[in-house]
Regions:
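A structural signal for short, well-ordered beta-strand segments
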Residues: 46, 106-108, 152-156
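Short Pro/Gly-enriched beta-strand edge/turn motifs at strand-loop
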Residues: 13-15, 25-30, 134-136
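Short, structured beta-strand-loop surface elements
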Residues: 62-120
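Short hydrophobic-aromatic micro-motifs
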Residues: 56-59, 78, 102-104, 152-153, ...
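Short connector loops at helix/strand junctions that flank enzyme active sites
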Residues: 24-26, 39-41, 51-53, 71-75, ...
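Short beta-strand segments
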Residues: 26-62, 78, 88-94
Length: 191
């Protein structure tokens, strides 16, 4: 772990070993990069497989400025957050959220091999729509689609992860009969 991935605020919430699980469970990656002195953060769907834990794959149009820049080997920072619960407190300051988040730093390259792009496409479909099989449940991506899509492989250099769990921590939250309400709305099992 270097200074850039060190958790400074609430270091006791550091859970570095959970980064792969967070990346595997997440649905949206916020991809940060700096291009010509201008910082950008763009949301992407992505593919991450815990059996190949040093890589994340992003895909989009060949016209994507973000993917073009990243594909040239630019440095990248990716953040994935899982919101597990809303924490209500009797005090405004102590309202909070239970979450798990991972931040990764790395560099990227364009995946130009058509066969590898096709495999990544199929894995992404299965990741977001489990159980669907190319050729049975949907038409596999033809060469024309693969040629119009840019796939970028991000090699992870380092990562950090942080989690907050538990209930409210306000000064009156543990006092029975204090005014107001407090508790947790669990968001993990909705839907």
């Amino acid at each position: 772990m270097s200074e850039r991935s060190q958790i400074r605020r609430h270091p006791e919430r550091s859970v570095p070993d959970e980064a792969p699980t967070i990346l595997a469970e997440g649905l949206v990656a916020h991809v940060g990069f700096c291009h010509r002195g201008q910082p950008f953060v763009i949301p992407f769907s992505y593919h991450y497989d815990e059996s190949d834990p040093d890589k994340i794959y992003l895909h989009g149009s060949v016209a994507s400025r973000a993917l073009q820049f990243l594909g040239d080997g630019g440095p990248v920072c990716i953040s994935v957050t899982l919101l597990d619960g809303l924490v209500y407190s009797r005090s405004a300051k102590y309202h909070s959220m239970n979450y798990r988040s991972a931040v990764v730093f790395g560099s990227a390259r364009v995946v130009s091999e058509e066969e590898k792009k096709a495999v990544i496409f199929d894995k992404m479909v299965d990741r977001y729509f489990a159980g669907r099989t190319a050729g049975r449940d949907y038409e596999a991506a033809p060469s024309a689609h693969l040629n119009n899509t840019l796939v970028v492989e991000v090699v992870i250099d380092e990562s950090s992860a942080k989690a907050r769990t538990g209930g409210p921590a306000g000064p009156t939250d543990a006092i029975d009969g204090a005014p107001g309400t407090c508790g947790i709305v669990d968001l993990r099992n909705l839907g």
